[in-house]
């Protein structure tokens, strides 16, 4: 978020195009830079087309209702993000929920949904509370077996997971097997705001015609577009930032485990330090803040009872001195 190239990209685009668009996309809110960013996202995810939203909450809220009817089925992971849950609620499709990353339970749901016209499996790429990665390759195997579409929310995985940070499809080798991706420009891709849906062209075309958050929300501001374009240029030029992130995550996790802490297994930048006691998680977070370390204590109802933890979000911007201060 503080990288000088992003800040300069935002400034240049605002100087060139102004502060805001004052319109939705289909009236007079589309500039060539919006199309350029959509093309950059498609290139990054190896997809055919992309549609931009004001936030990923809007992307997830606007993806199901245009595509599915009461004759169809949505099969959703139990730990999917709230935006997916709300998007499913806006749709008349029959709903199934399977236990987190449980392929046997997913198969049970798919078998039950065989009478529906279309089926879509929906999962986070990385689950935001635990930091675990969805087994997207196995999900795709079941989707092919039971003739279902696959949708992955890459908000917590894109830019982080995979050999070069291209997300779960790079990690699981599932390019061309995932039909729809959603994601955010508010985490690894700049940290401000903005969301997107990317995938097969016919799906994106339908969303452009019928997705209400896209049709009735103002376009992303030029400064967001300018910074986001710079993000994808940087990621294409070098893997340095991703490599630094992976180094930081591995160092922090290994040192914390050596110190006796219980850390949820993860390949992501989310490190859940398990404390299991709600009050203790609040006290720990408050004491760390007094030391200049900003972390968040999570407890019921955000996480299940008895699963209280501190969630540490690492970035490529952290240096070794900062990590050691937190660990010690």
Task: List where the protein language model places each region.
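Conserved PLP-binding catalytic core of the aspartate aminotransferase-like
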Residues: 1, 243-252, 257-292, 302, ...
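Conserved N-terminal alpha-helix of the aminotransferase class I/II PLP-enzyme fold
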Residues: 7-56
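PLP-dependent enzyme catalytic core of the Aspartate aminotransferase-like
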Residues: 12, 16, 39, 43, ...
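Conserved PLP-anchoring active-site segment centered on the Schiff-base-forming lysine
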Residues: 63-82
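Short, structured coil segments at secondary-structure junctions
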Residues: 70, 90-92, 146, 177
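Active-site phosphate-binding strand-loop segment of PLP-dependent enzymes
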Residues: 96, 100-152
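Active-site C-terminal subdomain of aminotransferase-like
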Residues: 146-149, 156, 161-267, 280
């Amino acid at each position: 978020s503080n990288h000088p190239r992003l800040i300069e990209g935002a400034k240049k685009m605002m100087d060139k195009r102004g502060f805001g668009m004052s319109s939705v996309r289909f009236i007079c809110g589309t500039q060539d830079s919006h199309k350029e960013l959509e093309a950059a996202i498609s290139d990054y995810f190896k997809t055919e087309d992309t549609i931009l939203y004001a936030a990923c909450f809007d992307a997830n809220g606007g993806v199901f209702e245009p595509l599915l009817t009461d004759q169809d089925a949505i099969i959703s992971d139990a730990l999917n993000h709230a935006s997916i849950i709300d998007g499913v609620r806006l749709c008349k499709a029959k709903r199934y929920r399977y236990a987190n990353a449980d392929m046997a339970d997913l198969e049970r749901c798919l078998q039950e949904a065989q009478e529906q016209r279309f089926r879509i499996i929906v999962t986070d790429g990385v689950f935001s509370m635990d930091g675990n990665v969805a087994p997207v390759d196995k999900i795709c195997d079941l989707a092919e077996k039971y003739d279902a579409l696959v949708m992955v929310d890459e908000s917590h995985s894109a830019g982080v997971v995979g050999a070069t940070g291209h997300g779960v499809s790079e990690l699981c080798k599932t390019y061309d097997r995932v039909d729809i991706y959603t994601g955010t420009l508010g985490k690894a891709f700049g940290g401000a705001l903005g969301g997107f849906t990317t995938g097969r062209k016919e799906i994106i075309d339908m969303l452009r015609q019928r997705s209400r958050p896209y049709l009735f929300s103002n376009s992303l501001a030029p400064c967001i577009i300018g910074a986001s374009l710079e993000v994808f240029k940087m990621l294409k030029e070098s893997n340095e930032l991703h490599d630094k992130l992976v180094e930081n995550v591995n160092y922090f996790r290994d040192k914390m485990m050596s110190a006796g802490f219980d850390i949820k297994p993860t390949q992501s930048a989310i490190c859940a330090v398990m404390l299991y006691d709600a009050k203790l998680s609040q006290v720990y977070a408050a004491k760390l803040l007094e030391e200049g370390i900003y972390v968040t204590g999570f407890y019921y109802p955000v996480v299940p009872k008895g699963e209280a933890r501190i969630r540490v979000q690492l970035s490529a911007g952290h240096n070794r001195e900062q990590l050691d201060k937190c660990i010690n």
